Amino acid sequence: LEVCVDFANPVGIITKGPLVARDVDVLTALAARASVSVTISIPFIDDDMGRRIEPYVARASRRFDALATLSAAGIRTGLSISPVIPGLNDSQIPQILARARECGATTAFMTLLRLPAEVLPVFTERLREAEPLRHGHVLSAIRDVRRGNLNSSEFGDRMSGHGPRWQA
């Protein structure tokens, strides 16, 4: 980042990690010379659900704090709701958006869960362990927005869904 400051090189960062906020001084210096944006991925509103599904990433509360810190410093911030997991976190989207806006985020996008062959067994096992009573419902909801499949690798189709549930 310091090299980017020296050369006034624009930077866009997309991360799940709140540690990006520790570079607020460098990002602020860069923002004075070039375009800077930081987008933080926050797929769950609450720490408990996030910890169960994504146990090795930072808590949602820490990510929201990072958004607030960067926004308060004048850094343009955004939100990525990724992955959207139908039947699990899709109902949280309005709350996540509202909280991110309170933290100063000015842009947002979302990406539907992708389950390529190597990820599918890991996800389904984690889901079964984390949500034993809901895992069948969640898999059904994913199929609902994926035209009956758990994944689509078609270009232009991989990151979004179809049908009324996805449109909502």
Feature locations, PLM:
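Active-site glycine- and acidic-residue-rich loops that bind
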Residues: 14-21, 85-94
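Short hydrophobic/aromatic-rich motifs at helix boundaries and adjacent loops
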Residues: 37-39, 68-70, 144-148
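Feature marks short, surface-exposed loop/turn motifs that line or immediately flank catalytic pockets
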Residues: 44-46, 85, 114-117
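Non-catalytic positions within long, well-ordered alpha-helices that form the structural scaffold/packing
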Residues: 5, 71, 98-101
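Auxiliary Fe-S-binding modules of radical SAM enzymes
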Residues: 65, 90-168
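Core AdoMet radical
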Residues: 1-67, 76-80, 107-111
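Glycine- and acidic
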Residues: 52, 78, 82, 155-161
